[in-house]
Design a protein with these regions (language model features):
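Short, contiguous pre-domain boundary segments
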Residues: 1-19
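A short N-terminal helical cap/helix-turn-helix that marks the beginning
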Residues: 22-48, 72-99
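Adenylate-forming
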Residues: 24, 82-86, 118, 122, ...
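Active-site diphosphate/adenylate-binding microenvironment
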Residues: 44-74
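Residue-level signal for alpha-helix termini/capping positions
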Residues: 87, 130, 134, 182, ...
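Short helix-terminating capping/connector loops at secondary-structure junctions
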Residues: 90-91, 134-138, 217-226
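Structural core segment of the AMP-binding/adenylate-forming
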Residues: 160-256, 279
Length: 285
């Protein structure tokens, strides 16, 4: 009997995974050091001395949790996603190829952003965060945007300056959005006035207004709002930045940083996930 190609591929992937996993358990220092070399680091020689921590403990039942992840290492997620590829000569290559569902005002939006263009857009927003919104490293930025390139721009801008991005699905209700804003103690809200999905227009600005009322009732107030496709009379939200300025030296290629990932029990709770671990998760998978 002929074995389907898909089955053979799946078996081969499983075999490779098992081999890789076994190697990572037996030689953890070498395993992670090899992967570290695929990224750009401020101190690239650190991985030559990566060693397994014999006192490492991931299980709280066995005592105090003790984890060290690349002690002394310094890198930046946005730099690895954008600058590193630009430095390899890929600046004019597509980083994002986007085609909207309906587009704003029912005009279909098709757009290709190169690595250079994506970096330029994210730098503009990063500057806006610093100079206008007074975002500091560790501050939380809620990204309540439809599936458009600006969502990626927001994440890259946050990563660049060490802010925390908390992505909230743009189809969520005002109550769900407010819960995530309050839970993460967000300082800035990035949004759009409208969204189109499946041919249906969603008035996000109405959801946002209601969510902000709920937040204020619970004692939390969003300090700044930035709106993509802003409405002319919506003065409470700042327009998406168009001007670029030099990023402050203290923020440029900020090391580390975190993102919020959703976790579910009886209610949503954000889990802080370091950018360092995030880039290795992507590469390993």
């Amino acid at each position: 009997m002929d074995v389907p190609v898909e089955t053979m591929d799946a078996q081969e992937r499983l075999r490779r995974y098992q081999e890789t996993y076994a190697y990572s358990i037996r030689y953890p220092g070498a395993f992670w050091a090899e992967r570290a070399q695929k990224f750009s680091w401020e101190n690239p020689n650190f991985f030559k001395t990566v060693e397994h921590n014999e006192h490492e403990n991931f299980d709280a039942r066995q005592g105090d949790v003790n984890i060290e992840f690349f002690k002394g290492a310094k890198t930046n997620l946005a730099y690895n996603c954008l600058d590193a590829n630009i430095n390899k000569g890929l600046g004019d290559k597509p980083a994002i190829i986007f085609e909207s569902d309906e587009g704003f005002r029912e005009e279909k939006r098709c757009e290709t952003l190169t690595y250079l263009q994506l970096k330029d857009k994210s730098d503009k927003l990063a500057n806006h965060f610093i100079y206008v919104c007074d975002v500091k490293p560790g501050d939380v930025v809620v990204c309540y945007l439809p599936m458009i390139p600006e969502a990626v721009v927001t994440m890259m801008a946050c990563a660049r300056i060490g802010a925390v991005h908390n992505v909230v699905f743009a189809g969520y209700s005002a109550e769900a959005l407010a819960k995530r804003i309050v839970d993460s103690k967000a300082k800035v809200l990035i949004s759009a006035a409208m969204s189109y999905r499946g041919g249906k227009a969603i008035e996000l600005f109405k959801i946002i207004a209601e969510a902000e009322k709920i937040c204020e009732m619970q004692g939390h107030k969003i300090e700044e709002r930035v709106c993509h496709f802003n409405l002319p009379d919506n003065e409470s939200h700042r327009d998406w930045p168009k001007e670029k300025a030099e990023i402050l030296a203290a923020y440029k290629q900020r090391h580390g940083g975190n993102e919020m990932s959703p976790a579910w029990t009886d209610a949503p709770h954000g889990i802080m996930r370091p950018y360092y671990g995030h880039i290795f998760l992507i590469e390993t998978n």
